[in-house]
Regions:
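Conserved beta-strand segments of the P-loop GTPase G domain that flank and frequently precede/overlap
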Residues: 128-130, 210-211, 242-244, 265-269
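Phosphate-binding/switch loop-helix module in NTP-utilizing enzymes
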Residues: 211-251, 258
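Short boundary/hinge segments that flank catalytic cores
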Residues: 36-157, 161-182, 186-190, 194, ...
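Short, aromatic-rich amphipathic segments at membrane interfaces
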Residues: 20-41
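Non-transmembrane alpha-helical coiled-coil
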Residues: 1-25, 69-71
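Conserved Switch II/interswitch segment of TRAFAC-class P-loop GTPases
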Residues: 245-250, 261-278
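Loop/turn-to-beta-strand initiation segments
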Residues: 155, 204-207, 235-243, 253, ...
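Soluble periplasmic/extracytoplasmic beta-strand elements of cell-envelope proteins
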Residues: 20-24, 81-83, 128, 207-210
Length: 285
């Protein structure tokens, strides 16, 4: 019986024996087949650089306001003649240019003044100051530029041509705000233009012609030839005339008034002026 079992086991082992045999011993490769470390590192590098750059690019696409001078230079070929630093609201009004002072704001306005004088021809006297929308510092720039010219010894007049919303009233201490250029434009035959001019308490060379009472027809008023006559008269008595005009992106008044100006100074403000506003600048070139 035992012999029979042994024979059966031998037959079973013979039937299940493998047909294969080891010809040569296998050796492990020096480098793994997977994962590919170099490919993973390269992909990580590309994603690590690409995702932040793409994110920043997308943020830039959604920003519709200028941030610095580089944005301005990309959007227009009009020369950038000055960069004003941010100014905290001064304790006394909005005039930061003073005689015998040399802080950074006053030096900046001196630079602006110098550049403008280089751009003006000999007989050109009228500088028009505008912006795209309210809140960009147009009247602030116009007022301090006028003071800077007065400190140069030039007889300077600043005229409030933003007759819908006079900004000079917030810049200067004007005693009779209801009397101004609109009175003359409305009734030139019975109004003395020079009686509307007020001396400034800032400097003896600085004079102010306020906007006056807000008229019901401002656009028609500035379109009249009497404005040309008024500016011609003023040019005979003053070395420089600064026109503080309305924001050109809001109303058409400034485009009409620009006919009497020799040079247009366009004020932009970082984080306020929209990039689309530069279509107005390029149209005014």
């Amino acid at each position: 019986m035992l012999l029979q079992k042994r024979e059966e086991n031998a037959i079973t082992l013979a039937a299940t024996a493998t047909n294969g045999r080891i010809i040569e011993q296998a050796l492990p490769d020096k480098y793994p087949v997977a994962p590919k470390k170099k490919i993973i590192a390269l992909a990580a590098l590309i994603l690590g650089l690409g995702i932040p750059v793409g994110f920043i690019y997308l943020i830039g696409l959604f920003k519709y306001k200028i941030e610095n001078a580089e944005d301005v230079q990309k959007l227009t070929t009009v020369p950038l003649i000055a960069e004003l630093p941010h100014c905290q609201k001064p304790a006394q009004g909005a005039i930061v240019v003073r005689e015998n002072h040399n802080d950074i704001m006053e030096e900046t306005f001196r630079g602006l003044r110098t550049n403008l004088l280089f751009m003006l021809e000999k007989e050109e006297k009228v500088i028009l100051v505008s912006s795209t929308q309210p809140g960009e510092g147009k009247s602030f720039v116009a007022g301090n530029l006028a003071v800077s010219l007065a400190l140069l010894g030039k007889k300077t007049l600043i005229v409030g041509m933003d007759i819908r919303k006079p900004g000079l009233n917030r810049v200067f201490n004007i005693s009779h705000r209801e009397h101004g250029i609109t009175n003359y434009l409305s009734d030139p035959e019975h109004t003395d233009l020079f009686s509307l001019v007020q001396p400034s308490d800032i400097h003896s060379n600085l004079y102010i012609l306020p906007g006056g009472a807000v008229p019901p027809n401002p656009t028609e008023l500035v379109a009249r030839p009497v404005l040309d006559s008024a500016i011609a008269q003023l040019k005979e008595h003053y070395d420089y005339i600064i026109l503080d005009t309305a924001p050109i992106g809001i109303v058409t008044d400034t485009a009409i008034v620009s006919r009497v100006g020799d040079l247009c100074l366009y004020v932009c403000r970082a984080e306020v002026t929209p990039k689309v506003a530069y279509q107005y600048i390029n149209e005014l070139k």
